[in-house]
Amino acid sequence: MEAAMGPSPVIREYETIREVRGPLLIVEGISDAAYDEIVEVELPSGERRRGRVLETARGYAVVQVFEGTTGISVTGTKVRFLGRTLEIKVSDEMLGRVFNGLGDPIDGGPPITSGVRRDINGEPLNPAARAYPEDFIQTGISAIDGMNTMVRGQKLPIFSGSGLPHNKLAVQIARQATVRSGEEFAVVFAAIGVMYDEAIFFKRFFEETGAIKRAALFINLADEPASVRLITPRVALTLAEHLAFDLGMHVLVILTDMTNYCEALREISAAREEVPGRQGYPGYMYSDLASIYERAGRAHGRKGSITQMPILTMPNDDITHPIPDLTGYITEGQIVLSRELHNRGIYPPINVLMSLSRLMKEGIGPGKTREDHANVSDQLYTAYSRAVELRSLAAIVGEESLSEVDRKYLRFGEAFEQRFLKQGFYENRSIEETLDLAWEILSILPESELYKIKDEYIRKYHPKYRKKQSQSSGGK
C-alpha cells in the first residue's frame, strides 16, 4: 500500500500524543491535519506503523492506527502527518493474486510495481453519468438466475445467518459467474474479518479450481485490528474501479462479511466516544455503507461495469436488524438464505419468497436470457407461494382433505425445492437449463393453473407440447 497524492506534500512530525484509546491516538498541538490524511507512527524501538486521520479539530487530531496501538507509548512515539491520502497501486497484474486487507501481497509473489495509483475512497459516479443496469449476469444458480436475476451494475446482497453456507455460495458464484462470450470478466473477492479456517478455505478453493486466474483476493483476518476492516472493502473496490472503468472489464465484487465491517465501525465509534445510534451502531452507518455500495454501477461512454454482491450475516436471523435494514435501503434487492431449508438439506437454501432483485426485469427477455423468462418466474413465485400455504393447511386438516389440484400444488412445492432450488456445489446451470427445469416442474400443475404465462409460451416450451413437436419432427 502506498500513500501519495499531489506534488511534494509537507510532512509534519509531532511527539504530543495525549492519549491511546483502543485503536486510536489523540495527538495534541496540531491544527492543520486533514480528514483521511495518512499518518506514520514511529515507536521508540524504531517500528513503524500506518494510520489515518479520522477526526480533526482545533488543537488536536484523532488518528486510527491500522496495525493496532499495542505497545505504543504516549512518550517517545513520533507521529508524522504525511499530507497525503491513502492510495494503492492497481493493475491487472493483481488478478491471480492474494492480498491482505491493506493491499499487500501475501501469496509469496512479488509486489505490484506497475499500474496506477488510486485513492481508496474512489470518486463517486456523477448520477447524470450513470447508465442504467440492463445486462444479465449468469451465476449458474437457478434460484438466482431464474427468479432473482443479477444485472450488471447492480448491488444485490445476500442476507444470511450464522452457520448458513453463505461462504460456500459466495465462492460457487465467484467460480461460475459469467457474462456474454467475448467480454472480459473478473472477480474481486474481499473477505472481511474472517476466521483463519475461512481464509484458508477461500484461498484453497480459488487456487484448486483455477478460479484464481480471473480473480483477486483480499483477505482480512478476524485477529487483525478493527481499523483494517474499514479499509479492506475500499481497497478491493479501488481495484475493481480500475479494471472496470480504465480497462473496460465487467467486474463482480463479492464482499463478505459486511456484518464484521459494521461491528468494526461500531467498535471505533465507541472508542471515539460518539453518541450511539440504533443498537450502539453509529448514526452515520447508513452513509458509510452507501459510500461502499454506491461504488457499483455503469457509466455512459465506458465499456466496463461493477456489480456488487455484499454478504452479511443477520444477528439472530433478524432481518430488521440495523445492518440488513440499512443495507436493504441502499441496495437493489436481496437474496435471503433460509435456516429451515438448510436444516432440510437443501443447498443453496435460498428463500425465494423473501428474496427480490429489483432490476431483474431490465436484464431478462429476448436477446438477454429467453422470451419466456419473466412469465416463468412470475408463475414459479405464484405457484410456490400457494404450495407453502397449502403445506401449512395440510398439516392441520390432513392432505387427504385437500382437492386434487391442491395436492398437485404440494407435489409441485416438493419438486421445486428438491429439483429447482437444490443443486450441487459444482453444478453450474445455464439459464436455458434453469428455465427448462422450471417448465418440467410447472408441468406437474394443470395447464389451467399456468395463468401467469402467455399461451404462446406454453405451446412453445411446455414439455407436453415440446414432446409432440419432437415426435412430429422425428416422423418427418
Swiss-Prot record:
Q: Where in the cell is it found?
A: Cell membrane
Q: What GO terms fall under cellular component here?
A: plasma membrane
Q: Which domain of life is it from?
A: Archaea
Under SUPFAM superfamilies, the record lists:
C-terminal domain of alpha and beta subunits of F1 ATP synthase, P-loop containing nucleoside triphosphate hydrolases
Q: Name one Pfam family in it.
A: ATP-synt_VA_C
Task: Keywords in alphabetical order, please.
Answer: ATP synthesis, Cell membrane, Hydrogen ion transport, Ion transport, Membrane, Transport
Under PROSITE patterns, the record lists: ATPASE_ALPHA_BETA
The record's listing under Gene3D superfamilies reads: 3.40.50.12240
Give the GO terms filed under biological process for this record. Answer: proton motive force-driven plasma membrane ATP synthesis
- Write out the GO MF terms: ATP binding; proton-transporting ATP synthase activity, rotational mechanism; proton-transporting ATPase activity, rotational mechanism
Q: Does the keyword Ion transport apply?
A: yes
Q: Which InterPro entries match?
A: ATP-synt_VA_C, ATPase_a/bsu_AS, ATPase_F1/V1/A1_a/bsu_N, ATPase_F1/V1/A1_a/bsu_nucl-bd, P-loop_NTPase, V-ATPase_su_B/beta
State where it is primarily located. membrane
The record gives the membrane topology as: Peripheral membrane protein
PANTHER family in UniProt = V-TYPE PROTON ATPASE SUBUNIT B (PTHR43389:SF4)
Quaternary form? Has multiple subunits with at least A(3), B(3), C, D, E, F, H, I and proteolipid K(x).
Q: Which family does it belong to?
A: Belongs to the ATPase alpha/beta chains family.
Give the protein's biological function: Component of the A-type ATP synthase that produces ATP from ADP in the presence of a proton gradient across the membrane. The B chain is a regulatory subunit.
Q: What is this protein called?
A: A-type ATP synthase subunit B
> Which species expresses this protein natively?
Hyperthermus butylicus (strain DSM 5456 / JCM 9403 / PLM1-5)
Tell me the name of the encoding gene: atpB
